[in-house]
Amino acid sequence: MELNTHNAEILLSAANKSHYPQDELPEIALAGRSNVGKSSFINTMLNRKNLARTSGKPGKTQLLNFFNIDDKMRFVDVPGYGYARVSKKEREKWGCMIEEYLTTRENLRAVVSLVDLRHAPSADDVQMYEFLKYYEIPVIIVATKADKIPRGKWNKHESAIKKKLNFDPSDDFILFSSVSKAGMDEAWDAILEKL
């Protein structure tokens, strides 16, 4: 599939399935804990500065945000998880919204699960990966902020993440930096393969 990634726009924000776009376009969901770099990932992948709002305040994305890419596919940004300053009730509401989307959306082709290369995956990261494996949803692990770690230590950090996740070697694992754009081509290859 040929994609003009510059031709991208935020389409709509949805709280439940009655608000989802009603068409057949394939979707790739982006999941990860708050401040893992999802907005930076979207902006880098689409060669845009501010298409997805980056925020110093974790937990800003509270709806499913659908991004139209060249009228051929969509990214769906789901609320960041694991942010403590959101009420338990609010977190449960997000959880139900995310679960409904991931388990019922026929357009969904795969989930890009973002983890921070600098840190061991959180319990939420592990739970998300196990959830995706349980529902047999194709998953691409993208380890963000690779530029914050010397290249010589990438393998060590990658191994630690894979071990904690009990990583399935048949899944894609991509080291990514929104600063240097390392991993961008590999991420697009993995995504397009799932469509």
Swiss-Prot record:
Signal peptide: none annotated. One of its GO terms (biological process) is division septum assembly. Residues 24-195 form the EngB-type G domain. GTP binds at residues 32-39, 59-63, 77-80, 144-147, 176-178. One of its GO terms (molecular function) is GTP binding. The keyword Transmembrane does not apply. Mg(2+) binds at residues 39, 61. It holds the Pfam family MMR_HSR1. The keyword GTP-binding applies. Keywords: Cell cycle, Cell division, GTP-binding, Magnesium, Metal-binding, Nucleotide-binding, Septation. Disulfide bonds: none annotated. InterPro entries: G_ENGB_dom (IPR030393), GTP-bd (IPR006073), GTP-bd_ribosome_bio_YsxC (IPR019987), P-loop_NTPase (IPR027417). Its cofactor is Mg(2+). GO terms for cellular component: cytosol. Necessary for normal cell division and for the maintenance of normal septation. Belongs to the TRAFAC class TrmE-Era-EngA-EngB-Septin-like GTPase superfamily. EngB GTPase family. This is Probable GTP-binding protein EngB. It comes from Streptococcus pneumoniae (strain JJA).
